[in-house]
Amino acid sequence: MTRSLAALCLSLLLGTAWAQQPIRILVGFPVGGTIDTVARLLADQMKDDLGAAVVVDSRPGAGGQIAAQALRQSAPDGRTLLLSPDHTMVMLPLTVKAPGFQPLSDFAPVGQVARYPGGLAVSKAAPVSNLAEFFAWAKANPAQANVGIPAPGSIPQFFVFTLARQAKAPLSSVPYRGSAPLVQDLLGGQIAAGTTALGDFVEHHAGGKLRVIAVLDQRRSPLLPEVPTFLEQGYKVDWEYWLGMFAPAGTPQAAIERVNAALGRALARPDVRERMQRIVFEPAHGTPAALGEKIRQGTAYWEPVVREAGWVLQ
């Protein structure tokens, strides 16, 4: 009874504090990008539920590192949140010498927001339509077997390493500064192939400007039902990209639970689901504990790959 009363009092105090000042959602990626779009959609839907203005605070750069550091330095009062992809929470601590944060000790998971597939696409001029043809072509043309990735040290880079090892193909990663320039070079034929979030390819695939030859997910995408997964084509790569919400460590549990509940209600709205699915994000609400477990599982999955690839901490 005492614990319940204390929780109720804290909840009332939090409600008063939130009504007086806005809640910030930090985003470490460019304005207008898919993660920024999701953040603004959630901010608009959650404000009434939380009884306060919710604003998106854009802190782009360094693969989300700048925004994550800003969260670490924020007060744990429930008014500063971070919308982050798996890259920031899993890969940065594995590939950067001093990321400035440790996900499981500096942050409090609030809940998963979405899952989304990846894809491997080839230029329109590439004479391939599936993985078997792509790897045969790569072996016959090793100097051209370059695969664009959105950033050095990103999940796509180590995904390409894993794929090359399984196929025994001479694939080389070519890092870009984001998915947009990668896709532009793919459309222009400056690079033979590229891998990033599937949503960056869908429109161009539909328009015949490039070809997606494999989907990185456990099942086919309803937007590209004709394109098989890597698993269907015989390759054991089934990583699921995800997006989650975090608060600073030490944030009161009542605040975490309140934001998680508001997040869940927002993600359950048909209009929110439709708008997220339009940019190839599948709403996937979960508990704080489940999100923390995703970080642990992701670290266990990628750490040996990073080590085997001989990655030197930057």
How would you label these PLM feature ranges?
Residues 20-22, 166, 253-314:
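An extracytoplasmic/periplasmic, membrane-proximal ligand-sensing/linker region
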Residues 73-79, 94-181, 242-275:
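Hinge/capping helix and adjacent helix->loop/strand transition within the periplasmic-binding protein
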Residues 88-97, 162-166, 193-225:
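A ligand-binding cleft/hinge motif common to bilobed small-molecule-binding domains
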Residues 115, 201-268, 300:
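C-terminal lobe and pocket-closing loops
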